[in-house]
């Protein structure tokens, strides 16, 4: 169960990083390209966006995961105090939990009694069944930040790469095409774990990219009028 949770957490960072990198970079450089049409400015802006946002997203992932770990540790410490100071009440809670899980009443009483006689086992049972947390929460904050950082860079480079090889107009079109394809593949790939319909999730990702293109295009068209 914990192994599955670790895979899901890692997948979340990877998918979020790739998706956000593709969508935000595509929207930004599309808008900048329409407003400026300066090839150097487009590439420089894309590189700056990818560099800054990848670090920002990695820091955000690290802090978010650290916060979750600290909250989980606090909950475990609190439960440890309750088990030590209120053993009868906690034992009754454990009995009730076992009954709710479908165990016969007599067996639930015996199971709670046996667990309460072993402080370590008692705490593990309460944390696992009442809090639904691991007794010793694993800290994957650095790993999550690493996945987010790398995924965002990879995702951000996808819409930017065409600008390194083609002029603005064809590069913009290729950027949109490869990013839409990348989003569709990413959405389809996630269904190998989620079990959803691959085409449905893929199209959902493409629609998100389409929103970014529209926003970038509107900003690129309207900003010269507003500024100048």
Task: Place the predicted regions along the sequence by residue.
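Juxtamembrane boundary at the C-terminal end of a transmembrane helix
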Residues: 217-228
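Structural signature of hydrophobic alpha-helical transmembrane segments
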Residues: 169-181
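Alpha-helical transmembrane segments of multipass membrane proteins
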Residues: 52, 56, 155, 159, ...
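Cytosol/matrix-facing amphipathic helices and coiled-coil assembly/linker segments
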Residues: 1-6, 66-148
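Internal alpha-helical transmembrane segments
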Residues: 1-66
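Interfacial loop-to-transmembrane junctions
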Residues: 185-210
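Transmembrane alpha-helical segments and their cytosolic interface motifs
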Residues: 10-28, 135-161
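Residue-level signature of catalytic and energy-coupling elements of molecular machines
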Residues: 20, 59, 108, 152, ...
